[in-house]
Structures are given as structure tokens and as C-alpha cells.
Amino acid sequence: MAGHSKFKNIQHRKGAQDKKKSKVFTKLIREIVTAVKTGASNVPENNPRLRKALNAARSQNLPKERIDKAINSANDASNNESYMEIRYEGYAPNGIAIIVEALTDNKNRTASEVRSSFTKYGGILGETGSVNYLFNHCGVIQYPINIASNEDIFEAAIQAGGNDIISDYITHTIYTDIENFYKALGFLTDKYGIPEDSYIGWIPVNTIIIDDKEKAKKLLKLIAVLEENDDVQRVFGNYMLSEDVYEIIQEE
């Protein structure tokens, strides 16, 4: 009986992992299609957004045939598939500002689903521009801490045109102006390889510390539900979990 239960748990975890991977692949494919359709070239070297999208896809092990299919689909003049880039803004419980970036082929559907998620978990969806003043809009490039020393990565970031770099015990994070993002990303990719993550995003000017476990779980549930939406590419918030709350949640 115990063996059967363990098997079921393994199957459940595998199913959840497969579902999560499928959603990641869907988001990657949408970004590839959008990069091709909005770029001036199908050649990654001449289309920085496409180069970034392809690097991200390969780092997530998106099969080559699916990458090629996405590019061919985007190049097909008879294919009307296209995605709109839309930003949603609102508040989670306890005054946490949330920005949601989406790529969608149906903005009414996405708006309804995002609004429903906010409402279900105690938040409120506002108008575009209602919270973005609480964030800096900039480029972010992240490498594992062991890729280079703090001094070397700092020097490389300056050469790449970065504005700031923060190194903790896990990650080097380089910040850039939006207009310099792809140039900096190309420079650092040539020097250190594909980064762990890179994006143009929203970094909070100030953060609200969440030091209550139940409040943290409710907030993280809202963010998880938003991120599970196929149309949602990224979710940003101006919060940070306290060390104690983070450790408690990690253990559960």
C-alpha cells in the first residue's frame, strides 16, 4: 500500500512538472514568434530580441523542431497568428504593487482571467499606469555567482554599458538602461555564455517586507496563479519575504 502511495506521489509530481514545462514552452514559443514578427530580420545576429528568445529556449531545452516550427510559422505570410504585448497593473493584499506582462492573441480573455485572479486572492486590478511609478523600468541580466569574481563581473558590466551590478551569494545581477539592454546582453553572452535569466522588467524602487506567513502564502498563491496563465510572461511585485518567513515556506 505504501509503495502504491509513493508511486502515485511520483506520478503526480511528474505530471505537475510536465505541465509546468509545457507552460514554459508555450511562453517561449510566443516570444520567438513575436520576436520574428516585430524584428527587422530573421537572423538572430541582426535581431537581438530573437537571439535572446532562442537562447532562452535552448537553455530550457525547447526541442529544435519546435523552435524551427515557431520561426517558420512567424515567417508564413498566410499565418495571421500574432500576439499583443499588454501590461496589467494592480494591488495584491496588504498594498503590494503588482505588474503583469502578457503576450496574448485575445486581450479580452486575458484581461478577464487576470482580473479574476486578482479578485479571487484579495487583490484589485487597476488601470495601466496605476502602480508603475513604484518601479524602475530597466534591463536585467543574471549570472550564477561562480561565473566570475565580483571584480571581473563588475568590470565586464561597465564595459557592457551596465548601470549597476549587485552580487549576493547566489547571483550576479546587472542592470541596464532599456536602450542598452540588448547591446549589454550580447556583450556579456559573448564573454560568459547564456545568462541564467535576462529580461526588460520592472524593479521596485522600494520593497515591502512580508513577515507574516499567511500573508506571504496568499501573495505567493496570487503570483503563482498569474504565472500559470499561458498569456502571462512575467509578474513583478514590490515585496520581499523576511528571512524567517522565507525559511518557513521553503520547509512546507
Swiss-Prot record:
This is Probable transcriptional regulatory protein RP455. The keyword Cell wall biogenesis/degradation does not apply. It is found in: Cytoplasm. Residues 1-22 are annotated as: Disordered. GO terms for biological process: regulation of DNA-templated transcription. InterPro entries: Integrase-like_N, TACO1_YebC-like_2nd/3rd_dom, TACO1_YebC_N, Transcrip_reg_TACO1-like, Transcrip_reg_TACO1-like_dom3, YebC-like. It holds the Pfam family TACO1_YebC_N. Belongs to the TACO1 family. Keywords: Cytoplasm, DNA-binding, Transcription, Transcription regulation. It comes from the Bacteria. One of its GO terms (cellular component) is cytoplasm. PANTHER family: PTHR12532:SF11, TRANSLATIONAL ACTIVATOR OF CYTOCHROME C OXIDASE 1. GO terms for molecular function: DNA binding. The keyword Cytoplasm applies.
